[in-house]
């Protein structure tokens, strides 16, 4: 019988239940040696090779004093230097190109699998980083090779001031509150909105496990697109009209009709669940053939959804 997959809490004083109740989407958590051996999952030469492919999403961020520059991949061989200080290479969805990196997702089996977006891997030369910023999604920062200093600030939102004209969404007034130095195997969890700034201490590789967190606008946009594929048999109908309704006035009764028409969709839980399951299991790169086949799965009331479709196989 195979042994259970390791989790982040095998060498931690807390367990998954405590983490979900007290930390998940609430406050940061540092776990030393959460994933020992993480530095062996991928090296910088493998990252450089991935960044040369047109099928792989990558970018290089360089910092010089207070100036930032971002260059999108793919990159020609030799363009990325391991010796230029203040440089960072970021490669998205490395879990789709490296079986070893993909195995790291097993450590997060205490969370819904369909919430995981991808594992981004970044290589940085000495003093490299992407600047102080915050994310709208949960992220686990796992230290691979080398060391990285992480400074954490307060909670941010859409009203937090950013540096104008910067190629990245960088915080204009970042005030560190806590500082951690991560070594190979260490893990730092950050909930959405926490300001953070990572700086390489020598050559450094960080693996970032990010989670899908669609905005309300994105949800409505996809739901509306999904509705367009249905037969157009639900039309707006007027409330009871009187001659006094002629002219330009918008009556509350009309808004009630519109609201009722839209509520038919959001109040239909089965319909909503079917759409959401297909939406959240849609592959990140549906048209790209990857080394590790992209597999996103969700179950709901006896139905199984795989990669954006309900699976009819028993």
Annotate each PLM feature.
Residues 2-8, 171-181, 197-314:
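Fe(II)/2-oxoglutarate
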Residues 2-22, 35-186, 194, 199-235:
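Active-site region of the double-stranded beta-helix
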